[in-house]
């Protein structure tokens, strides 16, 4: 199971997050990084649901939209896992 504490903190506060926080969150929920070397952004995809993708800038301070996207994407993942009968 993913880092639910981090997800809940991000749900409450959308600002103040960096690329390392996003990396920890996405990886904890099973996303894999598929970034090409020297790319300006990191790209994450979930192996069971390849349409669930995220792009994260390589910055220590990210705009609020990155946290909003992360929360929405992980909520979609949890809904799909629940519908499939898996453990979120």
Task: Write out the residue ranges for each language-model feature.
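Basic nucleic-acid-binding interfaces
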Residues: 1-36, 46-88
């Amino acid at each position: 199971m993913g880092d639910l504490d981090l997800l809940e903190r991000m749900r409450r506060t959308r600002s103040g997050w960096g690329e390392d926080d996003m990396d920890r969150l996405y990886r904890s929920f099973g996303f894999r990084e598929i970034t090409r070397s020297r790319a300006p952004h990191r790209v994450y995809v979930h192996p069971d649901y390849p349409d669930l993708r995220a792009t994260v800038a390589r910055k220590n301070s990210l705009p609020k939209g990155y946290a909003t996207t992360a929360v929405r994407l992980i909520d979609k993942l949890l809904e799909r896992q629940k519908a499939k009968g898996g453990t979120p």
